């Protein structure tokens, strides 16, 4: 196998030679997961964009990957891509695989060179270039990004971009162009000629655009509190920041101690200077360069000292650490049908995870397999997993790895497991205690590069501690069934499970493998679906008008064309195209040859179809006596929707709603022409509700929302059939007369598919709770007489959500007055969602459940002859007269028998509990060879609820619900136990979607291994990633010393809590936010403190419309101050959302940090995607100030808290008096008086706190100046 050269020792000239070789390219064999046959391609490095590209021909790149996204370069034939092409023989030392991507499941590029020397060269070169890319300065990254934009529109890698291409690019990077005049004016400013920009001009255009959009942020440096005062900021070069000013800024505003060295300050400045003439002993930054620095990762909010490992912290007992832990590590997705993969183990281990789970089952040939038992998840070999663990366990972190074994294997296969552990892991496997007489766990340092087995262990007499209660429900009937769909008249596959005499089923499993065979389209019809085919255009003049309008808008490119049916000759067509500023027409003639229709423009060249003819002349020139020309851009047909079954030209809103209400399926839809306007509406069903969304016309485009542009309604529908339109709903069922007629025949089907019947309407449970209630996230002081003033935590009732970011509501004595919507959160919807969660809490399918059948209300019968082309069918016949039967089918007779017996036992009231117990009693044997490998992590179950007298050699595992119960009832006992013993907490079985629970309260009580689903990009996994970013991402973080104090209480009563710090945050702007779909983002930011319940708080900014490239909040956004009780155990979290066309928030990016690791000042917040992977150039700019609370100030903050609580009580009492007439009484005036007095007092307290902060900043700035 090829070994990688140590590139750090190579001299610079050798590195340059290697990079030059990669840039020239190498012909290699490319292995693909999607193609069974390897292909020869030229693979080369594009230095300007930092991308690896592969191509068949020089002018057409087939694919590329960003070098910054590379996670691993693996030598040899160590990927599945090579296994799929076993017939192709390549030496292992010529092969390697690049693993890359920003999701949990990585993409692969598997390559084979023709020589070992080439392989070594590429392995070394990629490592050199990856290091350079990861250390590149922000200006270098910007230049690379700009190159990518140019190359994305022209793969020839030319050094310029046209006005038309620029207009295309800007919406793709999240910026809405107001019109072509806006761009032309910008081109004049930068001196571009003839609507064409060189790369240097494109770079200048970018700099001017970003500066003009965000220059208002620099007003922050014109205030008295600033440590230096900026001059004119109207233009990028209007004023400058000089060396001494920059040093003062770094030292006193940013509190950067390294800035005491002027040489380091000078070096930092020169990275951001765009003109080498200014790289002198006294450099200066123009104001646009200073603004770029503020947004740069060099100015990050994260303190880099926490990227280093603190070896002094690694000598405590293992029980004193939080340990990064994974649940069901082998899965890449949900718990029902996702793929199991050894790569998932590798991904977790290389991400620093130190406790991984192996779910072991008996496999073929006497060798165990790993998968999620009784589900459709794929199976992987135990031996392969152990090999992967050995190879990757200590790449990222050298500290111990714990293997948590979920054992389901027979004794014989357990012996094989023990054999593989010993043979493969060798000296890495811990087989005896580090100290024979120790009374506590060893430290991570003592266990470096050791692998610990967590598994049941035989006692002195051969008995084993097995908790039968934990296992008794595990053997249940679950799996895939076909259900007969009476609407679509077909079988659909669902994941089903039986529990508590109920059969729960998931949504239908979309066919990904057994797709319907593609119907061959006759050659004469191939052109029907092409955008250039316009069918029968009214007249020649109409065709000319279409071409003229399109060319006027897009730049009049010769060869722009459309095809239409001939007005004069049957079976013939007309090709209309643009040449030299006018429209020309050619007749496409047809003729019969041997019974086959042929089409031609010239007699000597005929084609079998119109499609083939057009494709030919798009690649070859159309030659005439007067000219020769190649067809270029097609003019899209503006009205292809008129022939679609989902389109209705004359349909009112009410009629559309009536039609949709009769189709009880999410994803049912139609599009209708709106009356009296040149606009349309899409009416669809989602979450059981019928919704409408307007589609406007903008020139030839159709616009959904404000910035999702489509060439046609057909393109719009096609797009949203593949992508979510509303939340997770995609368009699936066109509402046609045939579908409505079929539904009328099956009118009772709603009783089965109306999923909302699973949930209880919140209004039925709590009718006294007013509708549309919101909760204040922060204090707000009215600035006008028609606005509300309220404190944090206030409940505002009867809210009217009006457009423009200002809502109306009732608070205290003020009725229907305005307040900013970003200061509140909607708790009505939150309560409903929480209720829904509680109702599905015990459902075996959890949130994936789409329906429940109560088996006590059905009789089960077999269909001996099968039904609807399925041989193995059983039917649930309702006991209630008039209800519809439900038909199920299986693929095998054995499955039919198992499901039939399970349901019949329930319907016959057979108690199977005793049988299950016996099943598990027969299966609790442990192989002594495997038992002997267990040293420190012996699970205990029988007495695990008793937390006294912990044994450091044991580990106690709790499902999240049990752990939550312990935390609520005896948090101190759990904390004391964890000071000596180990606990592991794992998600409940109902989390079949692989969602995660909140780990914070468990961390607070000292639980070391809080196992989460690493493959799920949710809030709690992001918090986990933030916690373990400490201590050099080793996977071990030492718990605060205060947690080991006898006086420490993880859940102290309110009287014992003290505010230790205030954190002031102001969101100023953002750059390069990611783009989700067709629409340009309308972003807003949520700032949240995550911690114990008393430390949790959040705040939202306003929404910026149609700008995800350079949004600004600085002029309107106020500073927000959070009170922190425990800075060691709290997180600062920035969430960036976009508000979609339905006013729903959609996640864009996040940044989550332990508060102890953040820095003060004007700081860049580099943004990450859901998987906590960096997003190129995406960042927020925030002002952040941390300030310890003095003892003299604690009384002031305590008074504020007490007043806020009292105001909440008074507000709710006043609301009852206002809404329930019979409750009015004499006490109301007293309540109003107390409410108003408290409100004034609270405002005075808050102003006093803010004044102290301002005085401190101003005095500091004067001192520094």
Swiss-Prot record:
The organism's taxonomic lineage, starting at the top: Eukaryota, Metazoa, Chordata, Craniata, Vertebrata
Subunit relationships: Part of a complex composed of EEIG1, TNFRSF11A/RANK, PLCG2, GAB2, TEC and BTK; complex formation increases in the presence of TNFSF11/RANKL. Interacts (via SH2 domain) with CSF1R (tyrosine phosphorylated). Interacts constitutively with THEMIS2.
Keywords in alphabetical order: Calcium, Hydrolase, Lipid degradation, Lipid metabolism, Membrane, Phosphoprotein, Repeat, SH2 domain, SH3 domain, Transducer
InterPro entries in alphabetical order: C2_dom, C2_domain_sf, EF-hand-dom_pair, PH-like_dom_sf, PH_domain, PI-PLC_fam, PLC-gamma, PLC-gamma_C-SH2
Summary of the function given for this chain in its UniProt record: The production of the second messenger molecules diacylglycerol (DAG) and inositol 1,4,5-trisphosphate (IP3) is mediated by activated phosphatidylinositol-specific phospholipase C enzymes. It is a crucial enzyme in transmembrane signaling.
Domain SH3 positions: 769-829
A Pfam family this chain is assigned to: PI-PLC-Y
Domain PI-PLC Y-box: 930-1044
SUPFAM superfamilies: C2 domain (Calcium/lipid-binding domain, CaLB), EF-hand, PH domain-like, PLC-like phosphodiesterases, SH2 domain, SH3-domain
Gene name of the record: Plcg2
GO biological process, any: positive regulation of intracellular signal transduction
Reaction catalysed by this enzyme: a 1,2-diacyl-sn-glycero-3-phospho-(1D-myo-inositol-4,5-bisphosphate) + H2O = 1D-myo-inositol 1,4,5-trisphosphate + a 1,2-diacyl-sn-glycerol + H(+)
Protein name per Swiss-Prot or TrEMBL: 1-phosphatidylinositol 4,5-bisphosphate phosphodiesterase gamma-2
Stretches assigned to the C2 domain: 1038-1169
Post-translational modification as stated in the protein's UniProt record: Phosphorylated on tyrosine residues by CSF1R. Phosphorylated on tyrosine residues by BTK and SYK; upon ligand-induced activation of a variety of growth factor receptors and immune system receptors. Phosphorylation leads to increased phospholipase activity.
Cross-referenced PROSITE patterns: C2 (PS50004), PH_DOMAIN (PS50003), PIPLC_X_DOMAIN (PS50007), PIPLC_Y_DOMAIN (PS50008), SH2 (PS50001), SH3 (PS50002)
List of residues that carry Phosphotyrosine: 753, 759, 1197, 1217, 1245
Subcellular location: Membrane raft
All copies of domain SH2, residue ranges: 532-635, 646-735
Co-factor requirement: Ca(2+)
